[in-house]
C-alpha cells in the first residue's frame, strides 16, 4: 500500500524494463532516473525496498556494473531505519533471486531479530540448494532451525519451521522433513505437511497399480 505514494520511481522502473530490449542505452538512462527518484522518497522502507527492486531488475538484465552499488544504498538506508530487520529481509529475498549468495550472507549478519534472521537464512539456504550448493544449504537450514529456538511466538516459529520442513520434503529429504516437523509447536502446521505427504503417497500407490 505504501508504494502507491511513491509510484514515480516504480513507473520509471517499469518503463526501463520494457525499454531494455529495444534500446538498452536509453533504458540505462531511465534506470538512473528511477534510482534518483527513489532516493528522494521520504519513507525509509519504501525507499530501500524500491532501490533493492531496481538493483534486482538491473541484475536480471545483465546491467551488473551498478547492481552492488544500488544494493548497498538500500542496505545503508535499512541500517539506519527503525524497520531495519524487515527491510534487510526484503533485500535478502532479492539478492537470493539474483543468486548473489555471498552478498546475502553478508547482509544476514546485520539482522538482529531471531525470527527475521531464521527466515532470511532459510531463504538463502533455499537459493543455495537450488543452484547445487547442497552442503552449504543444509548448514544454513540447520542454523535457521537453531535460531528458531529463540523465537518465543509459537505461531511465527511454527510458520518458519513449516516452510523449512516443506523445503526438505520437496528436495526428497523426507527424514529431515520429519525431524523438523517434530519441532513445530502448533499441530495445524504439522498436519498441513503430513496431509500433503499422505496425499502424495496415495497418488504414487495409485500410479504403481495403474489406477
UniProtKB/Swiss-Prot annotation:
Keywords: Plasmid. Gene3D superfamilies: Tetratricopeptide repeat domain. The lineage of its organism: Archaea, Methanobacteriati, Methanobacteriota, Methanomada group, Methanococci. This is Uncharacterized protein MJECL18. It comes from the Archaea.
